[in-house]
Amino acid sequence: MPIVIPKDLPATETLENENIFVITEHRAIHQDIRPLKIAIVNLMPKKIETETQLLRLLGNIPIQVSIDLIHPKTHHSKNISEKHLLSFYKTIDDIKNEKFDGMIITGAPVEQIAFEDVDYFQELKTIMDFSVTNVFSTLHICWGAQAALYYHYNINKNILPKKVFGVFSHHININKGTVKLLRGFDDKFYVPHSRHTEVKKEDIEKVPELEIFAESNEVGPYIIASKNGRQIFITGHPEYDANTLKSEYYRDINLGKHIEIPKNYFKNNNPREELIANWRGHANLLFSNWLNYYVYQETPYSYISI
């Protein structure tokens, strides 16, 4: 089934070249199908890149999905044109009276700043309140997960001695037969991480409403969920393209920053050799399981009932 996106969205050409079925909102109106309504709160600076990454994953399932792109109006984006935001994005004010089957809140490169000092955090709190009352299930990614754990459950982040950067092995630490989100997961799977902060396992375990579904011996908890399944927290970046960590590495090198080579990413740990992208199967399974089992099979048919 197709993913419904705004006309002329830059990601369209890339997705079509990858044989991902996309249609415009105008065409979708004439089809007698009730698509899943998904809001993507895109906090990443490279908006088009993140749009493409997420739409690729959402478009790889047999369910029609309609997308609304959301950005914080209280933040001035330096890496995207105002025209792009005006053409393709909405704000929380535009959607405050709507209901959504699902929402994705992305990461943001602000994890070394205190939450309350992030210029759009007050607006993000409004969005997170909205996600509780007007969204059936919300998937939070990296800093988005840390911000939500802080706001909803008073779990603060902790600065790491050095950046977690690379691709890391993870395992399931719960009976995966009882958790639909984990269906089909390998016993060991890989996920990219790129962050300066963490949420400690012991802090999560103090909250009875939360469960840790999967973690890494090297980088800690990875998938955390509320027991009702309506809040999912992902501490890594499964949506990343094969080249994203490489781009981040050379960006920091060119800025004169001290940055270690991303772990378990380049063959022989050598940036001059080919990279190893071994997380795409996991990423597709994670997003399809979330959409199928936590959104599609659970959300009411009528938006009013959400």
Curated annotation (Swiss-Prot):
Signal peptide: none
Predominant localisation class: cytoplasm
Domain of life of the organism encoding this protein: Bacteria
Compartment annotation: Cytoplasm
Keywords in alphabetical order: Acyltransferase, Amino-acid biosynthesis, Cytoplasm, Methionine biosynthesis, Transferase
PANTHER family the UniProt entry points to: HOMOSERINE O-SUCCINYLTRANSFERASE (PTHR20919:SF0)
Stated name of the protein: Homoserine O-acetyltransferase
Gene behind the chain: metAA
